[in-house]
């Protein structure tokens, strides 16, 4: 076991054993509980909430801050990848007696299959399985080929596409036989092809966009011939008419589109014509208008939450424009879920008791806060809504008071969505 008993240290040996020890002791717990039986819904939320989709870890899945505050960005990404793999296994096998041993055995089997097909590493293993997985995770996160001084758009020097491992592992757990190489190639090629297409919608690939695309290309683990084809396309020296097979999995297509949105909205202020062309990319990915809108909002919410680390969104004027631009879209998402939200609220006896009381007398400040918390907690159980929540519910509660006036006392409606303030101020 690692030497420091107060920290999880993916840079040290035996950190996986320590992770299991803490989990068994109840020190590590999943930070949410969804009323959803769909792994796809959960992964959609988790990848965006934690930053795994963007190769930029902003939070962990199981590990409290006290165990991980000391970690480098690369170490956080190692832990986050492992946590996501563990979560995926638990989704299918949560009732097993020795879940840790069976998970590691399963994961080792997966990486033996995956790694041999895609030539991810050239390692020999004579250690126990935990140490073997530690070495594999280290290899997966490490970026083998660096560009320039290694400082990319977000100062990243780790593999930006490790989320693909989780998607492939999920398939591995569901299907006895699947072509890991073909699925890996299909997802990664589509990511790079469509992100390049999105970078070109304003007529030019800007420097920050080019650096991000080349960084992801180096993370791709694609065959050299395919990488050369994509690099030529990125550098605009190859005809756009490339034969491409779109992913059949809806979640995979959503992730691809969200990365396209991330590239555009994270690098500059998107104009209406660019937004229209972005929606066309979503349409080409066989997403319907509602799916395009929701996927776009997932990505843009991640940018808003983490804007201090992104260039354009860190400017006050741009932030205000960015926020105003997506308010109405958030409201539509909430509106489409109105019946479901009302149904969940009616199941909460405490909420309904307070609501009933509010019709005959004013609630105390404590009761108002409790009612807000009830509303907030219910939204957190819905993956398609939980992603939009900032700490304290700063963005959603004013909108909710307009959508559900019959479910909230008038005292909750003193703030309007036009009275925007930066939630972090």
Regions found by a protein language model. Give the residues of each.
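Small-residue-enriched hydrophobic alpha-helices in membranes
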Residues: 1-376, 380-384, 393, 401-406, ...
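Hydrophobic alpha-helical transmembrane segments
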Residues: 386-388
């Amino acid at each position: 076991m690692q030497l420091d008993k107060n920290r999880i240290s993916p840079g040290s040996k035996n950190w996986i054993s320590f992770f299991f020890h803490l989990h068994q002791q109840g020190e590590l717990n999943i930070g949410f509980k969804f009323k959803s039986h769909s792994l796809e819904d959960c992964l959609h939320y988790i990848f965006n909430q934690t930053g795994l989709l963007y190769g930029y870890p902003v939070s962990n899945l199981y590990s409290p801050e006290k165990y991980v505050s000391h970690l480098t960005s690369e170490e956080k990404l190692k832990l986050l990848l492992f946590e996501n793999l563990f979560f995926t296994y638990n989704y299918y096998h949560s009732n097993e007696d020795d879940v840790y041993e069976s998970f590691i055995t399963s994961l080792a089997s997966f990486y033996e299959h995956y790694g041999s097909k895609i030539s991810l590493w050239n390692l020999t293993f004579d250690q126990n399985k935990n140490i073997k997985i530690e070495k594999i995770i280290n290899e997966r996160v490490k970026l083998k080929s660096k560009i320039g001084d290694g400082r990319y758009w977000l100062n990243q020097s780790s593999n930006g596409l490790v989320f693909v491992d989780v998607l492939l592992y999920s398939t591995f757990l569901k299907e006895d036989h699947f072509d890991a190489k073909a699925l890996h190639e299909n997802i990664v090629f589509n990511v790079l092809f469509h992100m390049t297409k999105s970078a070109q919608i304003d007529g030019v690939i800007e420097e920050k966009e080019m650096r991000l695309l080349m960084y992801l290309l180096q993370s791709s683990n694609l065959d050299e011939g395919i990488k050369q084809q994509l690099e030529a396309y990125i550098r605009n020296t190859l005809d756009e008419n490339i034969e491409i097979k779109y992913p059949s999995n809806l979640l995979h297509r959503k992730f691809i589109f969200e990365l396209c949105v991330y590239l555009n909205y994270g690098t500059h202020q998107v104009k209406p014509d660019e937004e229209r062309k972005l929606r066309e990319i979503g349409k080409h990915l066989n997403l319907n208008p509602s799916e395009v809108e929701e996927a776009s909002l997932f990505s843009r919410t991640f940018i808003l939450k983490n804007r201090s680390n992104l260039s354009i969104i860190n400017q006050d004027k741009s932030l205000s424009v960015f926020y105003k631009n997506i308010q109405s879209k958030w409201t539509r998402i909430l509106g489409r879920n109105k019946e479901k939200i009302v149904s969940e609220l009616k199941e909460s006896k405490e909420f309904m008791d307070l609501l009933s009381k509010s019709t005959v007398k004013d609630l105390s400040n404590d009761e108002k806060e409790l009612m807000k918390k009830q509303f907030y907690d219910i939204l957190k159980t819905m993956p398609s809504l939980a992603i939009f929540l900032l700490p304290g519910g700063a963005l959603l509660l004013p909108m909710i008071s307009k959508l559900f006036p019959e479910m909230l006392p008038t005292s909750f409606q003193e703030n309007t969505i036009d009275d925007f303030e930066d939630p972090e101020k």
